[in-house]
Structures are given as C-alpha cells and as structure tokens.
Amino acid sequence: LNLIGRKFNFEHIERLLLKLKKLEICLIGDPILDTYTFCQTEGISSKSPTLASIFKKKETYPGGVLAVSEMANALGIKVNLITYGKKLNSKIQLNNRIKFNSINKFQPIPEIERIINMNRMEKLHQMYYFQNFPQNKKILPILKKKINYFLKNKKSIYLIDFGFNFFSSDFFNYISKVKYSVNTHTNSVN
C-alpha cells in the first residue's frame, strides 16, 4: 500500500474508478454456486477410519461468471451476463443491476462444496455437483447473435470458462475469428 500511495494519489484513483462507471461489458460463461460447509472436527470415528465432525453452518456464494459479474458491478461497471440456469435461486441472488440472460433456464447450475474445519480454517474435502452443459445446435447461433450485438456496439466481451462444456469447439472456432480482442479465463476439473 505504501508503494501505491507514493505512486498514485487519491484523486488519480478516483478518476480511474469514475472511468469504470462508464464501461459496459458482456460476460459469457459458467455459473457456479460455491458452498462452504463449516464443521468442528472431533477426531476419528471409533467404528471406521472416518473423520467425525459436528456441523456448524453452511454458506453459499455466487461463483464462476456470477462472481465476476458481481465484482465488476461493484466497481460500477454495467454488466450484461450471458450464462445458463435460473436467475433466482433460493441459495443466492444477483444484484438487480446486472442484466441476466440465460440461454438454458433448465440446465442446473454447477455447485462446488467445500467442507471446512472451523478450528484451523482448513479445507478438509471438496465435492463437485454438476452435469456437463448439453451441447445442441440451437446454442451456437444464440451465442453468435449475442456476441455480434456487443461487437457491433463496441462493448468488451469476456469469456469465463470453468470447463462445464458451455463452450463447444465450434464456438471457440467462431470466437477465434473475431477481429476484436476477446479475453478468456479457463479453469477446469474435467
């Protein structure tokens, strides 16, 4: 912080933040529900080599492209989100300023559950609950149409790929031919 403070004053940082409020971006990608189950470990079970724990609490947060959209929105950036799944979920809700476009409302949102030992704040286990996104011929034209709209209006497009098969190889072939810069983040358990 001292280095930042010496190099940039408050007014400079404020000007940069005000510029962010003028931006409009399009985020396309995998939504994820990040669930944290907190427990207190008690030791090994007497009847089997199983870790015995007492449940304390469970918290769920938006992850994947949902988290990216929330962070960008918190900086004042206008966000157009293209993803899948239902907008409202009993576990999380997005900021209502984020324009949510679901191209498949029936596809379940992947969930990653992490079991955390509260005593040491250490991750004991991680479980993935997901189905790969079913590819069909209707999805690619929908994505192309939405991307072309944002390209025509000179808006930045960011692809957020967590490996749940949302983007087909045909989509990547298409996007690689786009003459504007497209930023991509990929991360996968598959």
Language model: regions and residue ranges:
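Ribokinase/PfkB-type carbohydrate-kinase core domain
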Residues: 1-49, 54-190
